[in-house]
Design a protein with these regions (language model features):
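Conserved core of the PLP fold type I
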Residues: 39, 125-300, 304, 310-345, ...
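N-terminal "arm"/small-domain region of PLP-dependent enzymes with the aminotransferase-like
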Residues: 2-165, 175, 483-488
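Short, solvent-exposed loop/turn segments at secondary-structure junctions
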Residues: 104-108, 197, 220-222, 243, ...
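Conserved glycine-rich beta-strand-loop-beta hairpin in the small C-terminal domain of fold type I
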Residues: 416-431, 442-461
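Preference for well-ordered, secondary-structure-rich cores of eukaryotic proteins
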Residues: 105, 109-113, 225-238, 244-255, ...
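PLP-dependent enzyme catalytic core of the Aspartate aminotransferase-like
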Residues: 113, 485, 497-546
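Conserved core segment of the aminotransferase class I/II
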Residues: 6-52, 64, 340-421
Length: 546
């Protein structure tokens, strides 16, 4: 069948009159979700049981419009992929009385694991010390499903599964997505990934061909550029301000695109990290996201929304002597305080949102998920079935035990509020340290509103060896000088979207995620000491610079 004509996907360039659903007003309360779950039987939860996230949504979305189709943007590779025929046979395993001589699923009697015990926090006592003292132990047995003790067990989780992930955890993820984002079209779906880097790799294969250019922020996640390069893809950087990507700049680039001069067809894919952007820490406001979305509609761009820092949004930093920032008083207040995601304003189904547990639970779990239209999720699942095969069952069982069976949506929101406050405290520590120790005549910054990163601008033209030394050489010398002083920050040039373009600004990225608070302050002191030495500045680290 031929793909739809261009008329079939003509963009609506003004969404200002479109009423978008409020995730809170459109959903039930988080503590009522479990009561709205559909009844299921054991076959839904068995080994390699296929599932569709549409069956796990707790509201009807039939009143919403369907997503547009994206045949004209999808790669030839994605269009011809047929999926995994052996996995498709798993749908018959739930038939009562069936004796399977088909799939090579090892018998669980040969799994050398009988029980899994995990000590986890109780609600309101989330710290490491509190968990050690008052945490509870949750247990997963080998045959809990057969014994009606639980719907997920070792025998199921440790065997082969579907590329979409287990039905058990996928249900929880779908409910969470509906609660927080509530996409404004009817045929949205979720499917699991093994993290956003893998999801990006698969998305690029789905939407591009060698020689294409992708749009992104001018400074972007280095691994995204490195993922794209071996596929024959290049990245064009869009100018930024403190709110991230500038929609007018993107519009101008696309409106004046010259295929011959650029050596590539007009881009049709935007990769963006809208919240706590890596590396700059910039967060797009709600208005900025709507403006970006309208430009994407105007030029028919598909959007890859990579948003691992979404729940690490913070209140503004107001200075060292300001009153303590209080946590949100309710789940409703917390969710309303979050900037709406691009997914939540996506009336066309032109967003693939990539979520992850890496920044809020554990990066080693290698579990994330993708939300997009049914068409795109189906293609993603067929790819996963012949590549990643879905996240590790051990990790899925652990997270399901914690999130679904122990915490539920209510306690998970409590945990997210806790994490938000912890990162706010860390952000404030690094801000105060910068104010105390960094020479402001050559270093400047804006406090981040989300995420894990602090972006420091260095006035390299004030370096005593400029202009006899290049910006690249000065950056290298500062980098090595900081290491000599016992600290490590990342070079801003590592995050260029396009290394071939000339750059006239010098940045370094610091993180407040890893080191203890007292070490963060000491690290910034050493950074300030190194910068002073490199620029030949007088003054000691310990006095605030005016």
């Amino acid at each position: 069948m031929a793909p739809p004509s261009a008329i079939a996907v003509e963009a609506v360039t003004d969404t200002s009159g479109v009423t978008l659903p409020d995730p809170l007003s459109a959903s039930v309360k988080s503590n009522e979700i479990y009561g709205r779950r559909r009844k299921t039987d054991k076959s839904q939860w068995g080994v390699a049981a296929p599932s569709d996230s549409v069956n796990f949504r707790y509201h009807s979305h039939d009143h919403k419009p369907k997503a547009k189709r994206w045949d004209h943007h999808v790669s030839h590779e994605a269009l011809i992929r047929k999926g995994n025929s052996l996995k498709q046979a798993a749908k018959y395993l739930g038939k009562p009385g069936l004796i399977s001589l088909g799939g090579g699923l090892p018998s669980s009697e040969y799994f050398p694991f009988a029980e899994l015990n995990l000590k986890v926090p109780t609600v309101g006592h989330f710290s490491e010390s509190e968990t050690k003292e008052s945490g509870i132990t949750i247990t997963a047995g080998k045959h809990d499903l057969a014994q009606d003790k639980s719907i997920f067990d070792i025998a199921t989780a440790f065997n082969y599964g579907q590329g979409s992930g287990s039905a058990q955890l996928l249900r929880w993820i779908t409910e969470h997505t509906e609660l927080v984002h509530n996409p404004p079209y009817s045929d949205w779906r979720c499917t699991m990934s093994i993290g956003s880097t893998s999801a990006l790799d698969m998305a690029l294969r789905m939407f591009t061909r060698p020689g294409d250019l992708i749009l992104s922020e001018e400074y972007t996640f280095a691994t995204a550029v490195e993922t794209a390069a071996p596929m024959g893809l290049r990245v064009t950087g869009i100018s930024m301000d403190e709110q991230g990507l500038l929609p007018d700049s993107m519009d101008h680039i696309l409106a004046t695109w010259d295929v011959k001069a650029r050596g590539a067809r007009k881009p049709h894919l935007l990769y963006t990290v809208p919240t706590g952007q890596n590396p700059t820490g910039a967060t797009q406001s709600a208005d900025r996201r709507r403006e970006i979305y309208r430009v994407c509609q105007k030029h028919d761009l598909y959007i890859l929304e990579d948003d691992p820092y979404y729940f690490l949004q913070m209140q503004p930093y107001t200075g060292p002597n300001s009153p303590d920032i209080l946590p949100p008083s309710s789940h409703s207040e917390f969710l309303k305080s979050l900037v709406p995601s691009l997914l939540s304003i996506d009336v066309d189904g032109r967003v693939m949102r990539m979520d992850s547990f890496s920044k809020v639970l554990s990066p080693g779990s290698r579990i994330g998920w993708v939300t997009a239209s049914e068409q795109i999720v189906h293609m993603y699942q067929m790819h996963a079935d012949v590549s990643t095969q879905g996240p590790a069952g051990m990790a899925q069982l652990i997270l399901w035990k914690l999130l679904d069976e122990h915490w539920g949506h209510v306690a998970y929101l409590d945990w997210l509020i806790h994490i938000r406050m912890e990162y706010t405290r860390r952000r404030d520590v690094i801000m105060q340290a910068c104010e105390k120790y960094l020479p402001k005549e050559v270093v400047s910054w804006k406090p981040p509103m989300a995420g894990m990163f602090h972006w420091l601008r260095i006035e390299f033209r004030q370096h005593p060896d400029y202009p006899s030394k290049s910006i690249e050489t000065i950056e290298e010398e500062i980098f090595m000088r900081v290491i000599e002083h016992g600290a490590l920050v990342m070079r801003g040039s590592w995050f260029y979207a396009n290394n071939e373009e000339e750059h006239d600004t010098l940045f370094f990225r610091a993180t407040y995620a890893a080191a203890p608070a007292e070490k963060i302050e000491e690290g910034i002191r050493r950074l300030g000491e190194a910068v002073r030495a490199e620029f030949g500045l007088k003054g000691s680290n310990g006095a605030t610079n005016g």
